[in-house]
Amino acid sequence: MTTATLHTNLGDIVIEMFEFQAPKTVANFVGLATGTKEYTDMSTGAKKTGNFYDGLIFHRVIEGFMIQGGCPMGKGFGDPGYKFEDEFHGELSFDRPYLLAMANSGPNTNGSQFFITVGPTPHLNRKHTIFGEVKDAASQGVVDAIATTQTGAGDKPTKDVVINSVTVA
């Protein structure tokens, strides 16, 4: 099983990836995280590779709901310069906390943004691709700490919560 570890300034979040239920989504995340997938730099328009998520922030945090990251602009409207289709699997539903899923702006608009739930969110079923889960207690504690951080306008944390790097094993 593939795992991805988000190394944040508040601690590490280890995620078990659902590569069998959401293979394209996992491949996209892993490719962006490890620098093997090409993306478009939103500030220059140039095509590039590199560790996409390194240095990005959790730009949206809603206590009791989710933490969201993966926007290269840090505001929620950025993407890697492409979109891809949803992957819904009958075995996966938003019936528990700590699920990793793609943020989107409608059907088949996945890119780089993702979120981790902090409670059951069944209203998201068949709207967002679930592609991983935070299983260990220490990692869940980091998610909870991020989810309860102070926020300001637009649900943005008042102090940046940074994804320093992502490792995949």
Describe these PLM feature segments.
Residues 1-169:
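Cyclophilin-like peptidyl-prolyl cis-trans isomerases
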